[in-house]
Amino acid sequence: MKELSANTGDKEVHDIDKLDSGITAHGILEVMQDGYGFIRSANYLPGENDVYVSPSQIRRFNLKTGDILEGNTRIKTQQEKFSALLYLSKINEMDPMKAMHRKNFEDMTPIFPNERLSLECGKTSTAMRIMDLMSPIGKGQRGMIVSPPKAGKTTLLKQVALSVQKNNPEVHLLILLIDERPEEVTDIRESIEGPNVEVIYSTFDELPEHHKRVSEMVIERAKRLVEHKKDVMILIDSITRLARAYNLTVPPSGRTLSGGLDPAALHMPKRFFGAARNMREGGSLTILATALVDTGSKMDDVVYEEFKGTGNMELVLDRKLSEKRMFPAIDIPKSSTRREDLLLNKDEQEAVEIMRRALNGMRAEEAVESILNMFSNTKNNNCLLY
């Protein structure tokens, strides 16, 4: 791609070789408002090793925020603070000339999820087997895990990530941890590793602007992958804390919902969550987000109410069950997936209907107890069905 370098104007290829520092830049692109951009490296955030990308290169190769770029940098002069990109060799692991002609994410056609992401794997946890039948996840699902504190939502999210990684290695996993405890970040980073896994985080001691910036980079990264017809899954913990961060950073609109929430603060988290979709042209973006309830904060309940009707899959965790040390603490009657007929086969649909009828009228604890007994007495879901 040397002859297409936009940074060196009309100079010949041999002049480019003189300018080449021999250092390869690799990272995610962030395009600034003024038209130029930077290749970021660690955790999608600004750092001293960032590489400058000129506006002409961005226009020529149709580059957008979230693209992963690879290319050589120019020899840095003493006056320059950042290295500059000399020429591009790859965009999202593809040839730049091919990557230029991709479709825009917004121009693709969203459809209902119709291909299931199987969560059951080997001697898997009961939680994954229950999810597989009672609230299945498809490629392109917009799912929500509704949970009170200490009900095991982070553990559940981790199990989902490990199951998806094992059963669906083609899916690119992006795990976004917002306002999370540092030790949990380390735990997730060490337990979920692989070529298709990225753990991006902003711990609770960071500024709200930091949370906002990280989340925007993650959603842009996911959109760029979907434009290349890849299957992507984002696991976010939690959408409530993301909404809180936006509430502190948006300019006040003059209106306030109960709990002190500015209605303008919900726009970006809704755009984030609403990006999940299955594409008719190929590719999908699945988002599984946790939402906090019963925290004692009115704001958290308002955020949950605002997001309630937007998802097409809901998994509800129950505090009473977790207090009784019944794990997984899933409130089965309240958990479901819309249009699950597209994801389950006939036998599974019949089994789910029988189970739901049997659970109707039971208290949550009794329902979970009877379901747990059913699952623990069988080796896998196939044994349960037949």
Model-identified regions with their sequence ranges:
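P-loop NTP-binding catalytic core
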Residues: I75-I145
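Phosphate-interacting basic helix/loop segments used at nucleotide- and nucleic-acid interfaces
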Residues: D17-A25, T126-I130, V218-K223, F272
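N-terminal "pre-motor" subdomain/linker immediately upstream of P-loop NTPase catalytic cores
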Residues: E3-A99
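P-loop NTPase catalytic core
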Residues: G152, V160-V164, N168-P169, L173-P195, ...
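ATP-binding Walker
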Residues: K139, A151-G152
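Short flexible coil/turn linkers enriched for glycine and charged/polar residues
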Residues: S21-I23, V31-G35, L45-G47, L63-D67, ...
